[in-house]
Amino acid sequence: MRISQICTVLSTVTSAVAVGVNPLPAPREISWGSSGPKSIAGELQLRTDSDSADGIVADAWNRAWETIVALRWVPAATEAPISSFEPFPTPTAGASKKSKRASNSLQYVNVQVKDIEADLQHGVDESYTLDVEEDSDTITINAETVWGALHAFTTLQQLVISDGHGGLIIEEPVNIKDSPLYPYRGIMLDTGRNFVSLPKIFEQLEGMSLSKLNVLHWHIDDAQSWPIWVDVYPEMVKDAYSPHEIYSRNDVRNIVNYARARGIRVIPEIDMPSHSSSGWKQVDPEMVTCTDSWWSNDDWPLHTAVEPNPGQLDIIYNKTYEVVGNVYKELSDIFPDHWFHVGGDEIQPNCFNFSTHVTKWFAEDPSRTYHDLAQYWVDHAVPIFQNYSQERRLVMWEDIALSADNAHDVPKNIVMQSWNNGLEYISNLTARGYDVIVSSSDFLYLDCGHGGFVTNDPRYNVMANPDANTPNFNYGGNGGSWCAPYKTWQRIYDYDFTLNLTETQAKHIIGATAPLWGEQVDDINVSSMFWPRAAALAELVWSGNRDANGNKRTTEMTQRILNFREYLVANGVQAQALVPKYCLQHPHACDLYRNQAAIQ
């Protein structure tokens, strides 16, 4: 059996009348009644006897209710059939509405959670049901865990809207049965290239919570800077950009706690052995190599890094593993998640030419290759990482298993994050039995299409198109962005990443992450670079991109994501505009094709 599309959404949407709300991500099953609006009493009171010891449910409800009351949300972009246009006018039938009797006002939110002790770890049950009945004064939420209850609240926030007269309503009785397609749904934040402040990190977590993303992959450091304090080697933060651009232990705890309160796991990444210069060299300069080399775009065959600045851990130097082990243990102690990302991407062989330890190791046995060197890292570093605890699960970039100089044997219990060659590498990794996080750069890299950041680049100094018939650097080419073009929300949403996988292979896909590499990102633009495009991924991995008949629902998604962008902004997330406001107010008037089934 072959899976021809990303798991067809099991979503069922039934409605006897039109409603304005259009929650994102779309629930798996939602059924609307037709008896008329359910008004909200002065305050919806939470009733539950099943909360966690630290009050996760109560705190989340308080935040949700405060948001509902403060916003008194009016949907900014509602769904409607495409309008009639000249020269093909269509008569408009007179509309009529039957009168509807008033129903009981809603006064309570009753929440029942089966397992209040379930920890926020990979695979935890996030399902919930939400029911608003015609003759009831209670919104009923049932969830297997508190984390499912939190998702119910974020759905409810989008269902309760202004009645236009100062009150609040839910437009019709509604029944929702919801759960995610994939357990791993994330974005990646890079704070190694540019520092991102705590308030801005919190802002991303708000967007994630509203869209039901549940993993913040935190790429903490890179060759350019080491921004996190570690007690064991306090000198490492000498390579932070400034004393004000350091994450303290308390900062990390605040980020983790803020995320957990919203059902979001924080998975740290320390990229090793490549992308490693800052921080490490302060502990022992001998444990890093090629840090003082020119990265060498001038003579690419000799390059020591794919971008400035170079630096890698010395794989053969014994003390490397002592220092790495100490840093890893300390960071593992302050991040409660069972998963830890240990990098493994873009190892540059030329960098090791600057290491006397590595060159001597090669000289001792001329049959040795860079594959053997990568395997040396796996054999010596991975046991240190895995032995932290029985629950520990490692994540690595695919390069360690698939690059030109990959290791021979990478344990199958390591999760591979796939970023190159799209469907080809996904198929390769899953066929070999690896669990895979999809981060294909052709679809999910959010920094793509913004040009290059390296300066002194003569390629831009061209005043006329040198070849009008062939795309080139400044004329139809990538303009310095290696992964151009820009990934629009439609590009992200349309990604069928299980295409042509067998059923067995498809089971190895645990989810997806949209990375935002930080070379051109800081506090000023981080939110607009993530949002609302990350919301397209959120729906893709929550309920899919197809309807119950297997048809792509990108056209249907349009008004939903346009409305959600406005909702993000109303909640303090500085999401980028996607279209002229005219398009929000005129459903599908900005479609490329009048044919509403143009996308298959």
From Swiss-Prot:
PANTHER family: BETA-HEXOSAMINIDASE, BETA-N-ACETYLHEXOSAMINIDASE
Keyword hit for Ribosomal protein: no
Pro-peptide positions on chain: 19-96
Signal in keyword set: yes
pH dependence: Optimum pH is around 5. More stable at alkaline than acidic pH.
Signal peptide span: 1-18
GO CC, alphabetical: extracellular region; membrane
Cellular localization per UniProt: Secreted
Sites marked Not glycosylated: N525
Biological processes annotated in GO: glycosaminoglycan metabolic process; polysaccharide catabolic process
Reactions accelerated catalytically: Hydrolysis of terminal non-reducing N-acetyl-D-hexosamine residues in N-acetyl-beta-D-hexosaminides
Annotated positions for site Important determinant of glycosidic bond specificity: V306
Regulation: Activated by non-covalent binding of the propeptide to the catalytic domain. The concentration of the propeptide is regulated in the endoplasmic reticulum and the propeptide thus regulates the amount of the active enzyme at various stages of the growth cycle. The dimeric enzyme has about half of the maximal activity in the presence of one bound propeptide, but is fully active with two bound O-glycosylated propeptides. Inhibited by N-acetylglucosamine (NAG)-thiazoline.
Enzyme class, spelled out: hydrolase
Function: However, hydrolyzes both GlcNAcbeta(1->6)GlcNAc and GlcNAcbeta(1->6)ManNAc. Part of the binary chitinolytic system. Involved in hydrolysis of chitobiose and higher chito-oligomers (produced from cell wall chitin by endochitinases), thus contributing to the formation of germ tubes, fruit-bodies and septa during hyphenation. Hydrolyzes synthetic substrate p-nitrophenyl-beta-N-acetyl-D-glucosaminide (pNP-GlcNAc).
Glycosylation sites: T78, S83, S84, N318, N353, N387, N428, N500, N525
Record's protein name: Beta-hexosaminidase
Gene field: nagA
E.C. no: 3.2.1.52
Complex formation: Homodimer. Oligosaccharide moieties may also take part in the dimerization. Dimerization is a pH-dependent reversible process. The individual catalytic cores dimerize and the catalytic core of one subunit in the active dimer interacts with the propeptide of the second subunit.
UniProt keyword terms in alphabetical order: Carbohydrate metabolism, Cleavage on pair of basic residues, Disulfide bond, Glycoprotein, Glycosidase, Hydrolase, Polysaccharide degradation, Secreted, Signal
